[in-house]
Structures are given as structure tokens and as C-alpha cells.
From Swiss-Prot:
Pathway: Protein modification; protein glycosylation
This protein's encoding gene: SRT1
UniProt subcellular location: Lipid droplet
Protein name: Dehydrodolichyl diphosphate synthase complex subunit SRT1
GO molecular function: ditrans,polycis-polyprenyl diphosphate synthase [(2E,6E)-farnesyl diphosphate specific] activity; prenyltransferase activity
Lineage per the UniProt record: Eukaryota, Fungi, Dikarya, Ascomycota, Saccharomycotina
Alphabetized SUPFAM superfamilies for the sequence: Undecaprenyl diphosphate synthase
Family: Belongs to the UPP synthase family.
Quaternary structure annotation from Swiss-Prot or TrEMBL: Forms an active dehydrodolichyl diphosphate synthase complex with NUS1.
Length: 343
């Protein structure tokens, strides 16, 4: 076996050194930029301008249609922490703050329901330390949301929280905490937050099928239809449709989330931004895009039906004769076709 020469070893070492130096420089530049941005944001004049700009943009968007149900796949917390050389816990905490900020915005825009993919059933396969960290953070955020939902001075006042998923996988203490928070916020009717924890779409549909079959056998109920099936899902009525699903961190997949809810004309947006960095303007542009195309679609549907009514009311003598032949007027295709290779 041929041993690598000293020059090759030095070249590999130099290459690694250059890569590490590049990463350190990128990290330093990002840190400086973040500090400068944080300093600018702390200026009272800039903060005043930013808040008023948000208010103007929100009022402008409320003029048109807004989605009733917006959902988030909150991906990128761990990479966010790793990029800043922070513990994984800090990344998840930053993600919690991002969700809270966007909930404020959605409620002000007039969105009735927000759902968030907080914990997949598959996440139980992660290291125990990280799972315990997520459970503890989830408990803290539950208490925080319950307090905000009952504080009339808080923007989330009058909100309702529902934890959906396979709660049999959670500890008795966690199930007790969830039940308490849901009871505290059950009177909220302005805004609903669904936290999917722990959740997968396959589990959601499996649970619904079991409940539907048991109900049919016990109560001799009529045939199971789509409406009844949908209402038995974890999110109940809100399982009917999700208008806008947003996933961050650059991955182009749904990760077994909201497969039933997005099957009917939903808009799915993918962002390369990590979840803790997902900002007001990023979400605003996505909702603005949804509102724009939703308005065009409704306009086209309305004018198309109006054109059909006008066309039907016009006497046949004034209607333009069709010169193109319809496909339905062609004879039936042959039963079989054989092709030879002869010249």
C-alpha cells in the first residue's frame, strides 16, 4: 500500500485550515451583522418607524381576503443553534419566540386558526436529553400562552389553545397539564392555536378511522362520509381545510404533516430561512401572495359563471358557430393497433 507523501499530508492539513478559517470568518461577520441589526432595532426612532410600518401593512392586507387557517412546520431550530455555537435548547427557545411573534401578527390580520408542528412522533427517536428539553420547554410555553390568553392587555387575549396528537405517548403529568391549559382557554372564540404534539398525519388518519368504525358499530350510524370523517380528526372542524402551509429551513417535504388538510387547493410555501429567523416580512409576503391569487381566482370564477349566463340568454341565431370539431365527435378508437417494422 502506497503511503501518502509529506506534501500530500501538508496539503490536506492546509485545506482543512482554510475551511475552518472561512467558517470562523463567516461566523464573525454574521455575529457583527446581528449585533448591528440589534443595535439599530433598539433605537427608539427606528422602533417607532418599524411598528408603524407593520401597522400600515397589516391594515392594507386586511382589506383583501386572508386565509382562515395558516399552518407552520417549524424547522431549523437545531441548525440555528449550531450556526451560532449555542446549546440546542437555545435554538428551540428562539423558535418559541418566533412562533409567539407570528401568532400576534396572524391574529391581527384576522386569521382565525393557526396550527404548528411542534413535535413529531418520530422525534421520540432523538437523544433523550433533547426530548426532555423539548418537553420541559413545551410545559413552560403552555403556561405562558394560558396567561397571555387570559390577560386582557395582551394581544393574544381571547385565544384558545388545543393540543392535538397521540397523547397516549405522553406522561400522565404532561396530559394533566394539557387538560388544565385547554380548560383555562376553552372560552376563547377569537383565535385558535393548534399545537401538534406529538403528531403525524398517518396517526391522525388511523385514529379517525378507528373512531369512525367504532362509532358506526356501536350506534349503527349511517354510512361514513367525508364530512363526518373530517370532523372526527384531531382538529375537528378545522381539519376541513388549511389554506396556507409554510415550511422553513429549505426542505421541500411535508414530513407526514397535514396531508389530509392540504389536499384541497392549499398553498404550500417553502422558505430557506431557519425558523428562528423567520420574520414578519417573510410571512407577510407569503400571505400577500396568497391573497392576491385568491382574489384573482374568485374574480375569474365569478366572471366565468356570469359569461355562461349571458351566453345562455343570447338567442341561438346570434351565437357564433363553432368551427372546431369536438373530440367527442370522433369515432371510437380501435380495440388494438399493430405496428410492423417493415419498410
Amino acid at each position: 500500500m502506497k503511503m501518502p507523501s509529506i506534501i500530500q499530508i501538508q496539503f490536506v492539513a492546509l485545506k482543512r485550515l482554510l475551511v475552518e478559517t472561512k467558517e470562523q470568518m463567516c461566523f464573525a461577520v454574521k455575529s457583527i451583522f446581528q449585533r448591528v441589526f440589534a443595535w439599530v432595532m433598539s433605537l427608539s426612532l427606528f422602533s417607532w418607524f418599524y411598528v408603524n410600518l407593520q401597522n400600515i401593512l397589516i391594515k392594507a392586507l386586511r382589506v383583501g381576503p386572508v386565509p382562515e387557517h395558516v399552518s407552520f412546520i417549524m424547522d431549523g431550530n437545531r441548525r440555528y443553534a449550531k450556526s451560532r455555537r449555542l446549546p440546542v435548547k437555545k435554538g428551540h427557545e428562539a423558535g418559541g419566540l418566533t412562533l409567539l411573534t407570528l401568532l400576534y401578527i396572524c391574529k391581527r390580520l384576522g386569521v382565525k386558526c393557526v396550527s404548528a408542528y411542534a413535535f413529531s412522533i418520530e422525534n421520540f427517536n432523538r437523544p433523550k436529553e433533547e426530548v426532555d428539553t423539548l418537553m420541559n420547554l413545551f410545559t413552560v410555553k403552555l403556561d405562558e400562552f394560558a396567561k397571555r390568553a387570559k390577560d386582557y392587555k395582551d394581544p393574544l387575549y381571547g385565544s384558545k389553545i388545543r393540543i392535538v396528537g397521540d397523547q397516549s405517548l405522553l406522561s400522565p403529568e404532561m396530559r394533566k397539564k394539557i387538560k388544565k391549559v385547554e380548560e383555562i382557554t376553552q372560552d376563547g372564540d377569537d383565535f385558535t392555536l393548534f399545537i401538534c404534539f406529538p403528531y403525524t398525519s398517518r396517526n391522525d388518519m388511523l385514529h379517525t378511522i378507528r373512531d369512525s368504525v367504532e362509532d358506526h358499530l356501536e350506534n349503527k350510524s349511517p354510512r361514513i362520509n367525508i364530512r363526518k370523517f373530517t370532523n372526527k380528526m384531531y382538529m375537528g372542524f378545522h381539519s376541513n381545510k388549511c389554506e396556507l402551509l409554510i415550511r422553513t429551513s429549505g426542505h421541500r417535504r411535508l414530513s407526514d404533516y397535514m396531508l389530509w388538510q392540504v389536499h384541497e387547493n392549499a398553498t404550500i410555501e417553502f422558505s430557506d430561512t431557519l425558523w428562528p429567523n423567520f420574520s414578519f416580512f417573510a410571512m407577510y409576503l407569503m400571505i400577500l401572495k396568497w391573497s392576491f391569487f385568491s382574489t384573482i381566482q374568485k374574480y375569474n370564477e365569478k366572471n366565468h359563471s356570469l359569461f355562461e349566463k349571458i351566453h345562455e340568454s343570447v338567442p341561438s341565431i346570434f351565437k357564433k358557430k363553432k368551427t372546431a370539431m369536438s373530440l367527442y365527435n370522433f369515432p371510437n378508437p380501435p380495440i388494438s393497433v399493430s405496428v410492423t417494422g417493415d419498410e
